[in-house]
Swiss-Prot record:
This is Larval cuticle protein 3. InterPro entries: CHIT_BIND_RR_consensus (IPR031311), Cuticle_Struct_Prot (IPR050468), Insect_cuticle (IPR000618). Residues 1-16 form the signal peptide. Component of the larval cuticle. GO terms for molecular function: structural constituent of chitin-based larval cuticle. It comes from Drosophila melanogaster (Fruit fly). The lineage of its organism: Eukaryota, Metazoa, Ecdysozoa, Arthropoda, Hexapoda. GO terms for cellular component: chitin-based extracellular matrix. Transmembrane segments: none annotated.
């Protein structure tokens, strides 16, 4: 499923601007993993490496219409898809009272 998403993402990058030229293209598939890289002359790029266990590490980046360089790195493994970027939303910090309550509960487990 992830490979389909990666291929569709690459196709969308290429289809976004018909006048974009490929600067670098690498697709090296081996029995123990793969390396894939695509660099376009408009600043868009994608790269990924995968191993025999299905773990994938990658990065994709582009220049937004506002001129902002967007970069997303990710890991896909037994814990699922884990993207990281300064532009991705993050949850608010856990309030101190909640952390204190969790610590109390862990220190005083139920006797049932």
């Amino acid at each position: 499923m992830f490979k389909i998403l990666l291929v569709c993402s690459l196709a969308a990058l290429v289809a976004a601007n018909a006048n974009v030229e490929v600067k670098e293209l690498v697709n090296d598939v081996q029995p123990d993993g793969f390396v894939s890289k695509l660099v376009l002359d408009d600043g868009s790029a994608s790269s990924a490496t995968g191993d025999i266990h299905g773990n994938i590490d990658g990065v994709f980046e582009w220049i937004s219409p506002e001129g902002v360089h967007v970069r997303v790195s990710y890991k896909a493994d037994e814990n699922g898809y884990q993207p990281q970027s300064d532009l991705l939303p993050t949850p608010p910090p856990i309030p101190a009272a909640i952390l204190k309550a969790i610590a109390y509960i862990e220190a005083n487990p139920s006797k049932n």
